[in-house]
Structures are given as structure tokens and as C-alpha cells.
UniProtKB/Swiss-Prot annotation:
Pfam families: GAPT
TM ranges: 10-30
Phenotypic effect of disruption: Mice are normal in appearance, size and fertility. In aged mice, the number of MZ B-cells is increased, and serum concentrations of IgM, IgG2b, and IgG3 are elevated.
Signal peptide (from-to): none
Protein name according to UniProt: Protein GAPT
Subunit structure: Interacts with GRB2.
Function of the molecule: Negatively regulates B-cell proliferation following stimulation through the B-cell receptor. May play an important role in maintenance of marginal zone (MZ) B-cells.
InterPro entries reported for this sequence: Protein_GAPT
Region (Disordered) residue spans: 117-157
GO cellular component annotations of the record: Golgi apparatus; plasma membrane
Localization terms from the record: Cell membrane
Source organism of the structure: Mus musculus (Mouse)
GO process terms (BP): B cell homeostasis; B cell proliferation involved in immune response
Length: 157
């Protein structure tokens, strides 16, 4: 395939243009890496992590001469942002959670976690035995034997 382009001017032009393109790409990459070391690359705010955004905010606040007083801070919070204390109160109130002081008696916890009943060695631990305390189930028994043999005769017309 390349034999037809060996001595033609088209092959020389294509080769030179590819070399120039490769040279431009190399210069662009070198410029990008040198520039990247001097100034850090910053992502847009929606792509940054929250922790890095907070670090950026603290850097900008400390470098600026503008100081926020506590009264101004309260007005900023009331504009549209909820404070963390309010958020924690909201998440702490669940409907189905019983709130009471912790139990000091160790006997109730012991009864919950320890099996104090003596073990029955004849009990089948891994078998398919049903316990009558939990199930109202009767094991199927074979049907009673029939005394008479029943024969079904076809109809004769």
C-alpha cells in the first residue's frame, strides 16, 4: 500500500504535516505541564468536594479585610440557610423512637442476651422438627388402611 507513495510529493507532504502536528502536540503538552505546576488547576464549584470548597472559603475570608459580626451572621443564616443546630434537631426527632433515660439494671440486658435455660440434648438442633409452642401443626399421618378393596368397573352398554 505504501509502495505507491514512495517517491510521490503527496507522501512527502503527508509525512511533513504529520511531523509538524506531532511537534505542535509536544509543545502544547510541555506548556500545559509547566503552567500547571505554577498555578493549580481548579475545578468548577459543582465538581469540587465540599471539604475543599470550605478550605477555599476559609482562605478567601482570611485574606479579605471584611469581618462578619455575630448579628450579621444570624441575619445571613435566616435568609435561606438553616443552621447545623436546627438540622440536628430535625433529624433527632423520629416518630417511632422511644426516648427514655438508659436502663441502669443489668438484669434486663442479661435476660435479653443470655440463654439461661438448660439445653435439652435430645432436641434436634438442625432437624426439621417443629416445636408445638410455635406452630399448631400436625404431622401428616398415612391414611388408615381400607379393609375392602374397591374395584371400578367400566360401564357396559
Amino acid at each position: 500500500m505504501l509502495e505507491c507513495f514512495e517517491s510521490s510529493p503527496v507522501a512527502v507532504a503527508v509525512g511533513v504535516s504529520l511531523l509538524v502536528l506531532l511537534l505542535l502536540c509536544g509543545i502544547g503538552c510541555a506548556w500545559h505541564w509547566n503552567r500547571r505546576e505554577s498555578t493549580p488547576f481548579t475545578l468548577p464549584k459543582f465538581m469540587q468536594r465540599r471539604s475543599s470548597r470550605q478550605k477555599d472559603v476559609t482562605k478567601t475570608v482570611s485574606s479579605s479585610a471584611y469581618v462578619i459580626s455575630p448579628s450579621m451572621k444570624a441575619s445571613v443564616e435566616s435568609k435561606g440557610h438553616k443552621s447545623t443546630a436546627k438540622r440536628n434537631k430535625m433529624h433527632g426527632n423520629y416518630e417511632n423512637v422511644e426516648v427514655c433515660p438508659p436502663c441502669t439494671e443489668g438484669t434486663t440486658e442479661k435476660a435479653l442476651y443470655e440463654n439461661t435455660q438448660p439445653s435439652n440434648l435430645e432436641e434436634h438442633v438442625y432437624g426439621n422438627q417443629t416445636d408445638p409452642l410455635y406452630y399448631n401443626f400436625q404431622k401428616p399421618s398415612p391414611p388408615p388402611p381400607q379393609d375392602d378393596d374397591i374395584y371400578i368397573l367400566p360401564d357396559c352398554d
